[in-house]
Amino acid sequence: MSADKLVVGVVGMPGAGKSVVVNAAKAMGYGIVVMGDEVREEAKRKGLEPTPENVGLVMLDLRRLEGEAAIAKRCIPKIWEKPENKVIVDGVRSLAEVEEFKKSFPKFVMVAVHASPEARFNRLFYRRRSDDPKDWQIFHERDLRELSVGLGNAIAMAEYMLVNEERLDVAKRKAVEILRKVEEKWMR
């Protein structure tokens, strides 16, 4: 466990393309922690189907019962367990989570990924993960739920922004460029 561990939080609306940054980071030797996995695991422990509604309710319930930074607190030990000295955290949702990560990791930086609602809906619709929306109404409800926990604030406060409206290869190249800038700044 090194106090010098670089931790990069990735924030973005569902379907924005956070996984592009995560995959680029993985190829660059980062350990990976996915915050949504913690919520999906909790839903499974409660015996709930991993639908968008159930996963969303579990996310809100965890924050209500354990505080706004509940999921970040649950992920911190997983970050420390990673053998890599640089770790990407996929799915930061609020400034409370950002502050929680900063308490544990002095080298914590945020990368936001942005894409239009139409692009995001299409990506989620065709990805077909169990908690992805099946129609526009469910997509819109999920967006509002995510924004209600402070996702927009976390996006606004990110140090780096990747706009993901182009081809996948362009987004991958942008992600690598951003991660190199982060490393240049934080891993001297």
Functional labels for PLM-detected ranges:
Residues 18:
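Conserved lysine of the Walker
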Residues 69-70, 126-181:
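Small-molecule kinase domains that catalyze NTP-dependent phosphoryl transfer to phosphate-bearing small molecules
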Residues 52-57, 99-153:
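A glycine- and Lys/Arg-enriched "phosphate-lid" helix/loop adjacent to the NTP-binding pocket
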Residues 13, 25:
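P-loop (Walker A) phosphate-binding loop of NTP-binding proteins
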Residues 21-22:
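Post-Walker A alpha-helix
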Residues 31, 109, 159-160:
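Well-ordered beta-strand positions
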Residues 31-88, 92-99, 103:
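ATP-dependent small-molecule kinase phosphotransfer cores
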